[in-house]
């Protein structure tokens, strides 16, 4: 029998919760470690639609990237608050939730490595090393196989990431050979 704890332990080997940023909330958000798991649903955010899909498909465990509970809950108001209703429906249907956020972003072979590999970057290095593991951390930096002018680079990003649009600020340098990336909200790191 596979349990919530078994799934959690396996995920933790891939992206240790110790790699999460101090401000983040990761791990078991809701549920019982001892519950049996037969079906898992993976999502970015635990939304009302995701929970409805989980209920309709008899899902035992949802694994999300973004935490179901990020800020401390002050109340569970079922008349007004959609998050409260999500939590109520999860509890009523005995569906557990595990969230792996910045630990998955930072992990070796985590989301930032995946984003770098989608661009076929070479000589990939960690942009901001984690204090506990120099092979892990937020962001990645690497070299393109060959330099691209800005227009071709934007087309390349759109193709590799399957995007319809890309916003760009074009500076004086119009040839791109080195790429730094940081999945998620990396605005705090722009001037680091």
Label the model's feature ranges:
Residues 1-192:
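Hydrophobic structural segments
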């Amino acid at each position: 029998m596979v349990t919530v704890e078994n799934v959690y332990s396996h995920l933790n080997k891939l992206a240790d919760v110790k790699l999460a940023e101090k401000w983040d909330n990761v791990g078991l958000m809701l549920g019982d470690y001892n519950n049996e798991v037969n079906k898992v649903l993976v999502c970015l955010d635990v939304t009302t639609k995701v929970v409805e899909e989980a209920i309709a498909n008899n899902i035992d465990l949802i694994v999300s990237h973004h935490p179901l509970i990020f800020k401390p809950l002050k109340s569970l108001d079922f008349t007004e608050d959609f998050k409260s209703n999500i939590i109520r429906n999860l509890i009523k249907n005995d569906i557990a939730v595990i969230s792996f956020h910045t630990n998955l972003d930072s992990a070796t072979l985590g989301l930032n490595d995946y984003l770098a590999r989608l661009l076929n970057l070479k000589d990939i290095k960690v942009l901001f090393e984690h204090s506990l593991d120099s092979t892990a951390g937020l962001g990645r930096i690497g070299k393109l196989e060959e330099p691209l002018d800005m227009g071709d680079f934007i087309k390349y990003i759109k193709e590799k990431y399957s995007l319809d649009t890309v916003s760009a600020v074009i500076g004086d340098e119009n040839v791109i050979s080195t790429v730094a990336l940081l999945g998620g909200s990396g605005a705090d790191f722009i001037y680091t």
